[in-house]
Amino acid sequence: MGTLSVNQNKLQKRLRRLAGEAITDYNMIEDGDKVMVCLSGGKDSYTMLDVLLHLQKVAPIKFDIVAVNMDQKQPGFPEHVLPAYLKELGVEYHIVEKDTYSVVKELVPEGKTTCSLCSRLRRGTLYTFADEIGATKMALGHHRDDIVETFFLNMFFNGALKGMPPKLRADDGRNVVIRPLAYCSEKDIQAYSDMKEFPIIPCNLCGSQENLQRQVVKDMLVEWERKHPGRTESIFRALQNVAPSQLADRNLFDFTSLKIDESATPRFLDVLNI
C-alpha cells in the first residue's frame, strides 16, 4: 500500500486514538502484560492486531504481543494464509489445532445455528491455551457495533439487560478478556480493512447461515443508523451511563428500603405564579 490519502490517514488515526482511549479508560493493558491477540482471519481481528502493534511502539509502557489463531478444521480453511502474514510482520504466533468443526456438525441439528456452541468451544480452547503460554490478557476483536448488538440480543431474546463488556474476567478467574476496539465502529473497521487489503479468511461454518438472530438485530441497527445517524453511538454511551435507581433490578438498587428523608429541605412550588 502506498502513501495514505488525507481521508485514509484520518481513518487510521481515528481507529488508533479510539483504541488507545478504550485501553486507557478500562486499564486493558498494563506494564509487563503478555497480550494474546486472537486472530480469526476476519477484518476485526486483523485491524485489532494492526492497531495494537502500533500502540506497542508508542505506548509509555512495555507489553508483549502473541498472535494466536485456532484452526477448527473447517473444510477449505487456508492454513497457509495467517502464518505467511504473521511471518511477514515478524509477530510471534501460534496456530492451535482443534477439530471443533466436527463436534459442532455432530451436535447441532440441521438448519439450526451453530454460533453459540462453536463460540463456547473456541473460547474454552483459547482460555486454556492462554493459561499455557502465560498470557495475562486475551484480546478479542469485538467492536462497538458488536457490543450494542449483543445488548439488544440479550434484551430481546434472554430477558437480560447485559452486553459485551470492554474488559471481562472469565468465569474461571484465570483469564482477563479485553476488547481494544470497543469504541470503534464496524464501518470504520471495514473501511480500514479494505484499505489495508488484509488477507481475509471467510468462515465456512457460520458465515453462510441465514436469518441468525444477530443478523436481524444488525439489520435493525443499520436501519436506525440510516434514519438517525449517530444512534448506535448514543446507545453505546447509554451503556456507559447506567442509573440503577431508574431501572427495576432489586439486586442493583435497594428499592425496598426507600423512605422519605425527613432531613431533606422542602421544595415548595408556587403554583400561583408559574
From Swiss-Prot:
Residues annotated to bind [4Fe-4S] cluster: 115, 118, 206
As for subcellular location, the record says: Cytoplasm
What are the GO cellular component annotations? cytoplasm
Pathway per its UniProt entry is:
tRNA modification
Instruction: Name what cofactor the protein needs.
Output: Mg(2+); [4Fe-4S] cluster
Q: Which GO terms describe its molecular function?
A: 4 iron, 4 sulfur cluster binding; ATP binding; magnesium ion binding; sulfurtransferase activity; tRNA binding
Report keywords, A-Z: 4Fe-4S, ATP-binding, Cytoplasm, Iron, Iron-sulfur, Magnesium, Metal-binding, Nucleotide-binding, RNA-binding, Transferase, tRNA processing, tRNA-binding
**Cofactor details (free text):** Binds 1 [4Fe-4S] cluster per subunit. The cluster is chelated by three Cys residues, the fourth Fe has a free coordination site that may bind a sulfur atom transferred from the persulfide of IscS.
Record GO biological process:
tRNA thio-modification
What top-tier enzyme class does this entry carry?
transferase
- E.C. numbers: 2.8.1.-
* Record's miscellaneous remark: The thiolation reaction likely consists of two steps: a first activation step by ATP to form an adenylated intermediate of the target base of tRNA, and a second nucleophilic substitution step of the sulfur (S) atom supplied by the hydrosulfide attached to the Fe-S cluster.
Cross-referenced PANTHER family, in alphabetical order?
Answer: AMINOTRAN_5 DOMAIN-CONTAINING PROTEIN, SULFURTRANSFERASE-RELATED
Q: How does it assemble?
A: Homodimer.
Recorded family membership: Belongs to the TtcA family.
The protein here is known as tRNA-cytidine(32) 2-sulfurtransferase
The record lists the organism as Pseudomonas entomophila (strain L48)
Q: Write the gene name.
A: ttcA
